[in-house]
Amino acid sequence: MAARRGKSTRTASEVGAAGPRASARSVNGAPTVPEAARPGARRNGPSRASGCRREKSGPDPREKPQVRTRTARAEDQAEGPSAPSERVEPPSAQGASLLRAGSCRAREARSARELRPQAGATELAAPARMEAPPGAWKLQTVLEKVRLSRHEISEAAEVVNWVVEHLLRRLQGGESEFKGVALLRTGSYYERVKISAPNEFDVMFKLEVPRIQLEEYCNSGAHYFVKFKRNPGGNPLEQFLEKEILSASKMLSKFRKIIKEEIKNIEGVTVERKRRGSPAVTLLISKPKEISVDIILALESKSSWPASTQKGLPISQWLGAKVKNNLKRQPFYLVPKHAKEGSGFQEETWRLSFSHIEKDILKNHGQSKTCCEIDGVKCCRKECLKLMKYLLEQLKKKFGNRRELAKFCSYHVKTAFFHVCTQDPHDNQWHLKNLECCFDNCVAYFLQCLKTEQLANYFIPGVNLFSRDLIDKPSKEFLSKQIEYERNNGFPVFW
Protein backbone atom coordinates (compact mmCIF):
# COMPACT_ATOMS: atom_id res chain seq x y z
CA MET A 1 0.00 0.00 0.00
CA ALA A 2 1.12 3.10 -0.17
CA ALA A 3 3.37 4.73 2.48
CA ARG A 4 0.72 4.10 4.58
CA ARG A 5 0.64 4.07 8.05
CA GLY A 6 2.71 5.23 10.98
CA LYS A 7 1.51 2.35 10.39
CA SER A 8 1.25 3.81 6.87
CA THR A 9 -2.46 3.89 6.43
CA ARG A 10 -2.52 5.37 9.90
CA THR A 11 -0.52 3.24 7.32
CA ALA A 12 1.17 6.55 4.93
CA SER A 13 -2.57 4.84 7.14
CA GLU A 14 -1.45 6.53 9.40
CA VAL A 15 -11.20 10.00 21.07
CA GLY A 16 -14.15 11.67 20.33
CA ALA A 17 -16.58 11.36 23.23
CA ALA A 18 -19.55 9.25 22.32
CA GLY A 19 -22.97 10.79 22.69
CA PRO A 20 -25.77 9.48 24.93
CA ARG A 21 -26.03 5.73 24.56
CA ALA A 22 -29.71 5.03 24.22
CA SER A 23 -30.42 1.30 23.98
CA ALA A 24 -26.69 0.63 24.12
CA ARG A 25 -25.59 -2.87 23.15
CA SER A 26 -22.48 -4.53 24.55
CA VAL A 27 -19.82 -5.68 22.13
CA ASN A 28 -19.27 -8.82 24.14
CA GLY A 29 -22.95 -9.47 24.17
CA ALA A 30 -23.01 -9.92 20.42
CA PRO A 31 -23.01 -13.47 19.58
CA THR A 32 12.41 -3.38 -12.05
CA VAL A 33 12.87 -1.28 -9.28
CA PRO A 34 14.53 1.73 -10.98
CA GLU A 35 18.30 1.83 -10.70
CA ALA A 36 18.16 4.79 -8.33
CA ALA A 37 15.98 2.85 -5.96
CA ARG A 38 18.38 -0.06 -5.65
CA PRO A 39 21.26 1.12 -3.46
CA GLY A 40 24.58 -0.46 -4.28
CA ALA A 41 22.98 -2.45 -7.09
CA ARG A 42 24.80 -4.74 -9.49
CA ARG A 43 23.46 -5.94 -12.82
CA ASN A 44 21.93 -9.38 -13.02
CA GLY A 45 24.30 -11.86 -11.42
CA PRO A 46 24.05 -15.65 -11.16
CA SER A 47 21.53 -17.33 -8.92
CA ARG A 48 22.94 -18.23 -5.53
CA ALA A 49 21.94 -19.62 -2.21
CA SER A 50 21.48 -17.17 0.60
CA GLY A 51 24.62 -15.56 1.96
CA CYS A 52 25.22 -12.58 4.20
CA ARG A 53 26.19 -9.44 2.34
CA ARG A 54 27.79 -7.75 5.30
CA GLU A 55 30.25 -4.95 5.70
CA LYS A 56 31.22 -3.96 9.20
CA SER A 57 29.26 -0.86 10.10
CA GLY A 58 31.18 2.13 11.33
CA PRO A 59 32.02 2.24 15.04
CA ASP A 60 29.49 3.76 17.35
CA PRO A 61 30.59 5.58 20.50
CA ARG A 62 28.32 3.31 22.53
CA GLU A 63 29.40 0.10 20.80
CA LYS A 64 30.20 -2.80 23.11
CA PRO A 65 33.09 -5.24 22.51
CA GLN A 66 32.05 -7.82 19.97
CA VAL A 67 32.10 -11.33 21.46
CA ARG A 68 -0.98 -18.47 -6.29
CA THR A 69 -3.66 -20.81 -4.66
CA ARG A 70 -1.95 -23.24 -2.41
CA THR A 71 -2.65 -26.24 -0.18
CA ALA A 72 -2.27 -25.89 3.58
CA ARG A 73 1.07 -24.33 4.55
CA ALA A 74 3.49 -25.48 7.22
CA GLU A 75 3.44 -21.98 8.72
CA ASP A 76 -0.33 -22.26 9.12
CA GLN A 77 0.15 -25.40 11.19
CA ALA A 78 2.19 -23.33 13.62
CA GLU A 79 0.18 -20.13 13.52
CA GLY A 80 -3.30 -21.35 12.59
CA PRO A 81 -5.43 -21.00 9.46
CA SER A 82 -5.19 -17.92 7.30
CA ALA A 83 -7.73 -15.20 7.90
CA PRO A 84 -10.19 -15.29 4.99
CA SER A 85 -10.95 -12.16 3.03
CA GLU A 86 -14.50 -11.88 4.20
CA ARG A 87 -14.29 -12.98 7.83
CA VAL A 88 -11.65 -13.08 10.56
CA GLU A 89 -11.14 -16.70 11.57
CA PRO A 90 -9.07 -17.00 14.76
CA PRO A 91 -5.81 -18.75 13.83
CA SER A 92 -4.32 -21.50 15.99
CA ALA A 93 -1.65 -20.63 18.23
CA GLN A 94 11.54 -24.70 18.33
CA GLY A 95 14.32 -24.35 19.19
CA ALA A 96 16.46 -21.23 19.32
CA SER A 97 18.81 -20.73 16.44
CA LEU A 98 22.28 -19.58 17.47
CA LEU A 99 24.49 -17.69 15.05
CA ARG A 100 28.25 -17.86 15.49
CA ALA A 101 30.62 -15.49 13.72
CA GLY A 102 31.63 -16.91 10.36
CA SER A 103 28.78 -19.41 10.14
CA CYS A 104 27.01 -17.67 7.26
CA ARG A 105 29.87 -18.33 4.89
CA ALA A 106 30.02 -21.99 5.87
CA ARG A 107 26.30 -22.37 5.29
CA GLU A 108 26.62 -20.51 2.01
CA ALA A 109 29.27 -22.94 0.80
CA ARG A 110 27.10 -25.91 1.76
CA SER A 111 24.07 -24.39 0.06
CA ALA A 112 26.05 -23.77 -3.12
CA ARG A 113 26.96 -27.48 -3.25
CA GLU A 114 23.55 -28.83 -2.27
CA LEU A 115 21.22 -26.47 -4.10
CA ARG A 116 22.16 -25.84 -7.69
CA PRO A 117 20.41 -22.85 -9.27
CA GLN A 118 17.96 -23.44 -12.09
CA ALA A 119 19.56 -23.43 -15.51
CA GLY A 120 19.62 -19.99 -17.02
CA ALA A 121 18.04 -18.39 -13.95
CA THR A 122 19.23 -14.94 -13.02
CA GLU A 123 18.62 -12.69 -10.05
CA LEU A 124 18.19 -8.96 -9.87
CA ALA A 125 20.99 -6.77 -8.60
CA ALA A 126 21.89 -6.95 -4.92
CA PRO A 127 24.21 -5.13 -2.52
CA ALA A 128 27.74 -6.48 -2.11
CA ARG A 129 28.18 -9.58 0.08
CA MET A 130 29.05 -8.99 3.70
CA GLU A 131 30.87 -10.77 6.48
CA ALA A 132 28.92 -12.80 9.00
CA PRO A 133 27.27 -10.71 11.70
CA PRO A 134 28.96 -10.67 15.09
CA GLY A 135 27.53 -11.86 18.38
CA ALA A 136 25.07 -14.60 19.25
CA TRP A 137 21.60 -14.19 17.75
CA LYS A 138 18.66 -16.17 18.91
CA LEU A 139 16.23 -15.03 16.28
CA GLN A 140 13.93 -18.00 16.64
CA THR A 141 13.53 -17.05 20.30
CA VAL A 142 12.62 -13.51 19.24
CA LEU A 143 10.04 -14.87 16.79
CA GLU A 144 8.52 -16.99 19.54
CA LYS A 145 8.30 -13.89 21.71
CA VAL A 146 6.38 -11.89 19.10
CA ARG A 147 4.12 -14.77 18.03
CA LEU A 148 0.45 -13.96 18.55
CA SER A 149 -1.38 -15.81 21.30
CA ARG A 150 -4.20 -18.01 20.01
CA HIS A 151 -6.45 -17.02 22.90
CA GLU A 152 -5.87 -13.30 22.35
CA ILE A 153 -6.47 -13.70 18.63
CA SER A 154 -9.80 -15.44 19.23
CA GLU A 155 -11.01 -12.73 21.59
CA ALA A 156 -9.89 -9.86 19.36
CA ALA A 157 -11.25 -11.44 16.18
CA GLU A 158 -14.68 -12.05 17.70
CA VAL A 159 -15.07 -8.46 18.87
CA VAL A 160 -13.70 -6.86 15.70
CA ASN A 161 -15.89 -9.07 13.51
CA TRP A 162 -19.03 -8.08 15.35
CA VAL A 163 -18.34 -4.33 15.30
CA VAL A 164 -17.30 -4.27 11.63
CA GLU A 165 -20.26 -6.34 10.46
CA HIS A 166 -22.63 -4.17 12.50
CA LEU A 167 -21.31 -1.03 10.77
CA LEU A 168 -21.42 -2.72 7.38
CA ARG A 169 -25.11 -3.57 7.80
CA ARG A 170 -25.82 0.02 8.79
CA LEU A 171 -24.05 1.44 5.73
CA GLN A 172 -25.70 -1.03 3.38
CA GLY A 173 -29.16 -0.37 4.74
CA GLY A 174 -31.69 2.26 3.74
CA GLU A 175 -30.82 4.93 1.20
CA SER A 176 -27.26 5.55 2.34
CA GLU A 177 -24.82 7.01 -0.19
CA PHE A 178 -22.59 4.09 0.79
CA LYS A 179 -25.20 1.41 0.22
CA GLY A 180 -22.93 -0.48 -2.18
CA VAL A 181 -19.98 -0.90 0.19
CA ALA A 182 -18.37 -4.30 0.70
CA LEU A 183 -15.69 -5.53 3.07
CA LEU A 184 -11.99 -5.86 2.24
CA ARG A 185 -9.69 -6.88 5.07
CA THR A 186 -6.11 -5.64 4.73
CA GLY A 187 -3.05 -4.96 6.86
CA SER A 188 -0.51 -7.01 8.80
CA TYR A 189 -2.99 -9.16 10.73
CA TYR A 190 -4.60 -10.47 7.56
CA GLU A 191 -1.19 -10.77 5.87
CA ARG A 192 -0.17 -12.98 8.83
CA VAL A 193 2.84 -10.81 9.67
CA LYS A 194 1.34 -9.08 12.72
CA ILE A 195 3.65 -9.15 15.72
CA SER A 196 3.40 -8.85 19.50
CA ALA A 197 -0.36 -8.44 20.00
CA PRO A 198 -3.56 -8.55 17.91
CA ASN A 199 -4.41 -4.97 18.87
CA GLU A 200 -4.54 -3.24 15.47
CA PHE A 201 -6.73 -4.05 12.49
CA ASP A 202 -7.17 -2.39 9.10
CA VAL A 203 -10.45 -2.81 7.27
CA MET A 204 -11.43 -1.30 3.92
CA PHE A 205 -15.03 -0.56 3.05
CA LYS A 206 -14.77 -0.65 -0.73
CA LEU A 207 -17.24 1.10 -2.99
CA GLU A 208 -17.21 0.39 -6.71
CA VAL A 209 -17.31 3.54 -8.84
CA PRO A 210 -17.66 2.68 -12.54
CA ARG A 211 -16.72 5.00 -15.39
CA ILE A 212 -14.33 7.29 -13.53
CA GLN A 213 -11.58 9.42 -15.01
CA LEU A 214 -8.35 10.08 -13.10
CA GLU A 215 -6.39 13.30 -13.33
CA GLU A 216 -2.92 13.04 -11.83
CA TYR A 217 -2.10 15.67 -9.21
CA CYS A 218 1.15 17.56 -9.88
CA ASN A 219 2.86 14.57 -11.54
CA SER A 220 2.88 12.88 -8.15
CA GLY A 221 2.19 9.40 -9.52
CA ALA A 222 0.27 8.48 -6.38
CA HIS A 223 -2.39 11.19 -5.91
CA TYR A 224 -5.29 11.87 -8.26
CA PHE A 225 -8.42 13.91 -8.76
CA VAL A 226 -11.42 11.69 -9.53
CA LYS A 227 -14.09 12.68 -12.06
CA PHE A 228 -17.04 10.81 -13.54
CA LYS A 229 -16.94 10.25 -17.29
CA ARG A 230 -20.68 10.68 -17.21
CA ASN A 231 -22.73 11.99 -14.36
CA PRO A 232 -26.34 10.98 -14.95
CA GLY A 233 -28.96 12.27 -12.56
CA GLY A 234 -29.62 10.18 -9.51
CA ASN A 235 -25.98 9.31 -8.81
CA PRO A 236 -25.87 9.08 -4.98
CA LEU A 237 -22.32 10.48 -5.01
CA GLU A 238 -23.37 13.63 -6.86
CA GLN A 239 -23.62 15.55 -3.57
CA PHE A 240 -19.85 15.08 -3.08
CA LEU A 241 -18.88 16.74 -6.36
CA GLU A 242 -16.88 19.95 -6.22
CA LYS A 243 -16.70 21.48 -9.72
CA GLU A 244 -17.00 18.01 -11.30
CA ILE A 245 -14.34 16.60 -8.96
CA LEU A 246 -15.33 13.92 -6.43
CA SER A 247 -14.21 15.52 -3.17
CA ALA A 248 -12.28 13.13 -0.95
CA SER A 249 -12.74 15.37 2.09
CA LYS A 250 -16.52 15.69 1.66
CA MET A 251 -16.97 11.99 1.15
CA LEU A 252 -14.77 11.05 4.11
CA SER A 253 -16.59 13.57 6.32
CA LYS A 254 -19.99 12.01 5.57
CA PHE A 255 -18.60 8.48 5.98
CA ARG A 256 -17.15 9.44 9.37
CA LYS A 257 -20.42 11.08 10.48
CA ILE A 258 -22.47 7.93 9.78
CA ILE A 259 -19.99 5.74 11.67
CA LYS A 260 -19.89 8.10 14.68
CA GLU A 261 -23.67 8.10 14.94
CA GLU A 262 -23.86 4.32 14.84
CA ILE A 263 -21.01 3.80 17.31
CA LYS A 264 -23.01 5.71 19.93
CA ASN A 265 -25.22 2.64 20.14
CA ILE A 266 -22.39 0.23 20.88
CA GLU A 267 -21.06 0.06 24.43
CA GLY A 268 -17.30 -0.04 24.87
CA VAL A 269 -16.48 1.45 21.46
CA THR A 270 -15.53 5.05 20.69
CA VAL A 271 -14.29 6.95 17.65
CA GLU A 272 -10.81 8.43 17.93
CA ARG A 273 -10.40 12.14 17.27
CA LYS A 274 -9.82 12.90 13.61
CA ARG A 275 -6.16 13.11 12.63
CA ARG A 276 -5.32 15.65 9.97
CA GLY A 277 -4.37 13.98 6.72
CA SER A 278 -5.41 10.49 7.83
CA PRO A 279 -7.74 8.51 5.53
CA ALA A 280 -9.01 6.34 8.37
CA VAL A 281 -11.89 6.46 10.81
CA THR A 282 -10.29 4.86 13.86
CA LEU A 283 -12.41 2.94 16.36
CA LEU A 284 -11.15 2.24 19.87
CA ILE A 285 -12.55 -0.93 21.42
CA SER A 286 -11.98 -1.11 25.18
CA LYS A 287 -12.92 -4.74 25.93
CA PRO A 288 -11.61 -7.41 26.33
CA LYS A 289 -8.42 -5.41 25.70
CA GLU A 290 -7.84 -2.13 23.93
CA ILE A 291 -7.98 -2.66 20.17
CA SER A 292 -7.84 -0.06 17.42
CA VAL A 293 -9.60 -0.64 14.12
CA ASP A 294 -8.84 1.61 11.16
CA ILE A 295 -11.83 1.74 8.83
CA ILE A 296 -10.87 3.16 5.45
CA LEU A 297 -13.24 4.12 2.68
CA ALA A 298 -11.86 2.99 -0.68
CA LEU A 299 -13.11 3.62 -4.20
CA GLU A 300 -12.79 0.50 -6.33
CA SER A 301 -11.91 0.89 -10.01
CA LYS A 302 -11.83 -2.02 -12.44
CA SER A 303 -10.10 0.05 -15.12
CA SER A 304 -6.48 -0.50 -16.14
CA TRP A 305 -3.95 0.54 -13.53
CA PRO A 306 -2.63 4.13 -13.95
CA ALA A 307 0.43 4.72 -16.13
CA SER A 308 2.54 5.57 -13.06
CA THR A 309 2.44 1.87 -12.09
CA GLN A 310 3.68 0.57 -15.44
CA LYS A 311 7.21 -0.21 -14.23
CA GLY A 312 6.12 -1.16 -10.73
CA LEU A 313 5.42 -4.56 -9.14
CA PRO A 314 8.78 -6.06 -10.25
CA ILE A 315 7.92 -9.69 -9.50
CA SER A 316 8.44 -11.34 -12.90
CA GLN A 317 11.65 -13.14 -11.87
CA TRP A 318 10.34 -13.83 -8.36
CA LEU A 319 6.70 -14.93 -8.68
CA GLY A 320 6.53 -15.05 -12.46
CA ALA A 321 5.20 -12.96 -15.33
CA LYS A 322 1.90 -14.85 -15.32
CA VAL A 323 1.28 -14.04 -11.66
CA LYS A 324 2.17 -10.40 -12.30
CA ASN A 325 -0.28 -10.16 -15.20
CA ASN A 326 -3.04 -11.76 -13.13
CA LEU A 327 -2.44 -9.37 -10.24
CA LYS A 328 -2.53 -6.35 -12.56
CA ARG A 329 -5.93 -7.47 -13.81
CA GLN A 330 -7.33 -7.01 -10.31
CA PRO A 331 -9.04 -3.71 -9.40
CA PHE A 332 -7.06 -0.90 -7.85
CA TYR A 333 -8.26 1.30 -5.02
CA LEU A 334 -8.26 5.00 -4.18
CA VAL A 335 -8.32 6.09 -0.54
CA PRO A 336 -9.02 9.61 0.80
CA LYS A 337 -5.39 10.27 1.74
CA HIS A 338 -4.74 13.84 0.63
CA ALA A 339 -1.63 15.08 -1.16
CA LYS A 340 0.55 17.54 0.73
CA GLU A 341 0.34 21.08 -0.60
CA GLY A 342 2.74 23.48 1.04
CA SER A 343 2.13 23.32 4.77
CA GLY A 344 -1.36 21.89 4.24
CA PHE A 345 -3.19 19.34 2.11
CA GLN A 346 -5.04 19.26 -1.19
CA GLU A 347 -8.25 17.84 0.27
CA GLU A 348 -9.93 16.85 -2.98
CA THR A 349 -7.24 14.30 -3.88
CA TRP A 350 -7.26 10.52 -3.54
CA ARG A 351 -4.23 8.22 -3.22
CA LEU A 352 -3.67 4.88 -4.95
CA SER A 353 -3.75 1.82 -2.70
CA PHE A 354 -2.57 -1.70 -3.48
CA SER A 355 -2.86 -3.24 -0.02
CA HIS A 356 -4.91 -6.12 -1.43
CA ILE A 357 -2.06 -6.98 -3.82
CA GLU A 358 0.45 -6.84 -0.96
CA LYS A 359 -1.69 -9.34 0.92
CA ASP A 360 -1.78 -11.68 -2.09
CA ILE A 361 2.00 -11.49 -2.51
CA LEU A 362 2.65 -12.32 1.13
CA LYS A 363 0.14 -15.16 1.09
CA ASN A 364 1.70 -16.74 -2.02
CA HIS A 365 5.27 -15.60 -1.55
CA GLY A 366 7.36 -18.47 -2.94
CA GLN A 367 8.84 -18.85 -6.39
CA SER A 368 7.97 -22.53 -6.09
CA LYS A 369 4.32 -23.45 -5.70
CA THR A 370 5.27 -25.76 -2.82
CA CYS A 371 7.14 -23.11 -0.81
CA CYS A 372 5.97 -23.30 2.82
CA GLU A 373 3.38 -25.99 2.06
CA ILE A 374 3.23 -28.98 4.39
CA ASP A 375 5.32 -31.13 2.05
CA GLY A 376 7.42 -28.26 0.75
CA VAL A 377 10.53 -26.45 1.93
CA LYS A 378 9.92 -23.80 4.58
CA CYS A 379 11.38 -20.41 3.70
CA CYS A 380 12.10 -17.53 6.08
CA ARG A 381 10.67 -14.60 4.10
CA LYS A 382 7.84 -13.81 6.51
CA GLU A 383 10.13 -14.36 9.50
CA CYS A 384 12.52 -11.73 8.15
CA LEU A 385 9.69 -9.25 7.65
CA LYS A 386 8.44 -9.83 11.20
CA LEU A 387 11.94 -9.26 12.59
CA MET A 388 12.34 -6.06 10.58
CA LYS A 389 8.99 -4.77 11.83
CA TYR A 390 9.94 -5.70 15.40
CA LEU A 391 13.29 -3.90 15.09
CA LEU A 392 11.59 -0.64 14.11
CA GLU A 393 8.88 -1.11 16.74
CA GLN A 394 11.43 -1.67 19.52
CA LEU A 395 13.54 1.32 18.49
CA LYS A 396 10.44 3.51 18.62
CA LYS A 397 9.74 2.21 22.13
CA LYS A 398 13.33 2.70 23.20
CA PHE A 399 13.44 6.33 22.13
CA GLY A 400 9.88 7.21 23.09
CA ASN A 401 8.64 10.32 21.37
CA ARG A 402 11.86 11.23 19.54
CA ARG A 403 10.94 13.44 16.61
CA GLU A 404 13.47 11.69 14.37
CA LEU A 405 11.51 8.41 14.37
CA ALA A 406 8.02 9.85 14.07
CA LYS A 407 7.73 9.56 10.28
CA PHE A 408 9.03 6.00 9.95
CA CYS A 409 6.46 3.23 9.82
CA SER A 410 6.09 -0.47 9.09
CA TYR A 411 5.21 0.30 5.47
CA HIS A 412 8.78 1.50 4.87
CA VAL A 413 10.07 -1.80 6.24
CA LYS A 414 7.64 -3.83 4.14
CA THR A 415 8.52 -1.93 0.96
CA ALA A 416 12.25 -2.54 1.50
CA PHE A 417 11.50 -6.21 2.19
CA PHE A 418 9.64 -6.55 -1.12
CA HIS A 419 12.64 -5.09 -2.93
CA VAL A 420 14.94 -7.65 -1.27
CA CYS A 421 12.57 -10.40 -2.45
CA THR A 422 12.92 -9.01 -5.97
CA GLN A 423 16.73 -9.01 -5.67
CA ASP A 424 16.78 -12.54 -4.23
CA PRO A 425 13.90 -14.20 -6.07
CA HIS A 426 14.80 -17.87 -5.56
CA ASP A 427 13.50 -19.99 -2.70
CA ASN A 428 16.97 -21.47 -2.09
CA GLN A 429 18.06 -17.95 -1.10
CA TRP A 430 15.57 -17.95 1.78
CA HIS A 431 16.05 -21.33 3.49
CA LEU A 432 14.84 -21.25 7.08
CA LYS A 433 18.23 -22.56 8.23
CA ASN A 434 19.73 -19.34 6.85
CA LEU A 435 17.38 -17.06 8.78
CA GLU A 436 20.19 -15.04 10.37
CA CYS A 437 21.88 -14.29 7.05
CA CYS A 438 18.61 -13.48 5.31
CA PHE A 439 17.61 -11.11 8.09
CA ASP A 440 21.00 -9.44 7.96
CA ASN A 441 20.61 -8.95 4.21
CA CYS A 442 17.27 -7.22 4.82
CA VAL A 443 18.86 -4.98 7.45
CA ALA A 444 21.73 -4.17 5.07
CA TYR A 445 19.35 -3.20 2.28
CA PHE A 446 17.29 -0.98 4.59
CA LEU A 447 20.44 0.74 5.84
CA GLN A 448 21.54 1.51 2.29
CA CYS A 449 18.10 2.93 1.53
CA LEU A 450 18.47 5.25 4.51
CA LYS A 451 21.99 6.31 3.55
CA THR A 452 21.18 6.93 -0.12
CA GLU A 453 17.75 8.42 0.73
CA GLN A 454 16.18 6.17 -1.88
CA LEU A 455 13.25 3.80 -1.28
CA ALA A 456 10.99 3.40 -4.30
CA ASN A 457 7.32 2.64 -3.81
CA TYR A 458 6.98 -0.99 -4.91
CA PHE A 459 4.00 -0.25 -7.15
CA ILE A 460 4.77 3.33 -8.21
CA PRO A 461 8.57 3.42 -8.71
CA GLY A 462 8.57 7.14 -9.43
CA VAL A 463 7.57 7.79 -5.82
CA ASN A 464 10.55 7.88 -3.42
CA LEU A 465 9.34 7.14 0.10
CA PHE A 466 12.63 8.46 1.53
CA SER A 467 12.69 11.76 -0.34
CA ARG A 468 13.55 14.83 1.74
CA ASP A 469 10.08 16.19 1.07
CA LEU A 470 8.70 13.30 3.11
CA ILE A 471 11.45 12.56 5.67
CA ASP A 472 14.30 14.94 6.52
CA LYS A 473 17.91 13.80 6.27
CA PRO A 474 18.73 14.08 10.03
CA SER A 475 15.88 11.65 10.80
CA LYS A 476 17.25 9.11 8.31
CA GLU A 477 20.76 9.54 9.74
CA PHE A 478 19.47 9.01 13.28
CA LEU A 479 17.63 5.79 12.41
CA SER A 480 20.60 4.53 10.39
CA LYS A 481 22.94 5.12 13.33
CA GLN A 482 20.65 3.25 15.74
CA ILE A 483 20.22 0.28 13.41
CA GLU A 484 24.00 0.08 12.86
CA TYR A 485 24.56 0.05 16.61
CA GLU A 486 22.02 -2.75 17.05
CA ARG A 487 23.49 -4.73 14.17
CA ASN A 488 27.05 -4.47 15.48
CA ASN A 489 26.05 -5.56 18.98
CA GLY A 490 23.73 -8.50 18.39
CA PHE A 491 20.49 -6.47 18.50
CA PRO A 492 20.21 -5.83 22.26
CA VAL A 493 16.91 -4.02 21.60
CA PHE A 494 15.34 -7.43 20.93
CA TRP A 495 15.93 -8.45 24.53
From Swiss-Prot:
Q: Write down which residues bear the modification named PolyADP-ribosyl glutamic acid.
A: E165
Q: How is its activity regulated?
A: The enzyme activity is strongly increased by double-stranded DNA (dsDNA), but not by single-stranded DNA or RNA. DNA-binding induces the formation of liquid-like droplets in which CGAS is activated. Liquid-like droplets also create a selective environment that restricts entry of negative regulators, such as TREX1 or BANF1/BAF, allowing sensing of DNA. A number of mechanisms exist to restrict its activity toward self-DNA.
- Spell out the residues of the site Arginine-anchor: R230
| Linked residues for Glycyl lysine isopeptide (Lys-Gly) (interchain with G-Cter in SUMO) | K206, K322, K359, K369
Q: Which GO terms describe its biological process?
A: activation of innate immune response; cAMP-mediated signaling; cellular response to exogenous dsRNA; cGAS/STING signaling pathway; cGMP-mediated signaling; defense response to virus; DNA damage response; DNA repair
Q: How is it modified after translation?
A: The N-terminal disordered part (1-134) is phosphorylated by AURKB during the G2-M transition, blocking CGAS liquid phase separation and preventing activation. Phosphorylation at Tyr-190 by BLK promotes cytosolic retention. Localizes into the nucleus following dephosphorylation at Tyr-190. Phosphorylation at Ser-410 activates the nucleotidyltransferase activity. Dephosphorylation at Ser-410 by PPP6C impairs its ability to bind GTP, thereby inactivating it. Phosphorylation at Ser-188 by PRKDC inhibits its cyclic GMP-AMP synthase activity by impairing homodimerization and activation. Ubiquitinated at Lys-389 via 'Lys-48'-linked polyubiquitin chains, leading to its SQSTM1-mediated autophagic degradation. Interaction with TRIM14 promotes recruitment of USP14, leading to deubiquitinate Lys-389 and stabilize CGAS. Ubiquitinated at Lys-359 by RNF185 via 'Lys-27'-linked polyubiquitination, promoting CGAS cyclic GMP-AMP synthase activity. Monoubiquitination at Lys-322 by TRIM56 promotes oligomerization and subsequent activation. Monoubiquitination by TRIM41 promotes CGAS activation. Ubiquitination at Lys-260 via 'Lys-48'-linked polyubiquitination promotes its degradation.
The region called Required for activation upon DNA viral infection is annotated at 103-134
Region Disordered: start-end pairs: 1-128
Q: For the modification N6-acetyllysine, which residues carry it?
A: K7, K56, K359, K369, K389
Q: Does the keyword Lipid biosynthesis apply?
A: no
Q: Which residues bind GTP?
A: T186, D294, R351, L352, S353, F354, S355, H356, I357, E358
Give the way it sits in the membrane.
Answer: Peripheral membrane protein
The residues that the entry says bind Mg(2+) are E200, D202, D294
Q: How and how many cofactors are bound, per the record note? A: Binds 1 Mg(2+) per subunit. Is also active with Mn(2+). Mn(2+)-activated enzyme forms an inverted pppGp(2'-5')A intermediate, suggesting a non-canonical but accelerated 2',3'-cGAMP cyclization without substrate flip-over. Mn(2+) ions are coordinated by triphosphate moiety of the inverted substrate, independent of the catalytic triad residues. Undergoes a liquid-like phase transition after binding to DNA, which is dependent on zinc.
Question: In this chain, where does the modification Phosphotyrosine occur?
Answer: Y190
Report the domain of life of the source organism: Eukaryota
The UniProt keyword set, sorted, is: Acetylation, ADP-ribosylation, Antiviral defense, ATP-binding, Cell membrane, Chromosome, Cytoplasm, DNA damage, DNA repair, DNA-binding, GTP-binding, Immunity, Innate immunity, Isopeptide bond, Lipid-binding, Lipoprotein, Magnesium, Membrane, Metal-binding, Methylation, Nucleotide-binding, Nucleotidyltransferase, Nucleus, Palmitate, Phosphoprotein, Transferase, Ubl conjugation, Zinc
The family classification in the record reads: Belongs to the mab-21 family.
Q: What is known of its domains?
A: The N-terminal disordered part (1-134) binds unspecifically dsDNA and expands the binding and moving range of CGAS on dsDNA. The disordered and positively charged residues enhance CGAS-DNA phase separation by increasing the valencies of DNA-binding. The N-terminus is required to sense chromatin and its phosphorylation blocks its activation by chromatin DNA. When the N-terminal part (1-134) is missing the protein bound to dsDNA homodimerizes. The arginine-anchor tightly binds to the canonical H2A acidic-patch residues.
What is the protein's name according to its record? Cyclic GMP-AMP synthase
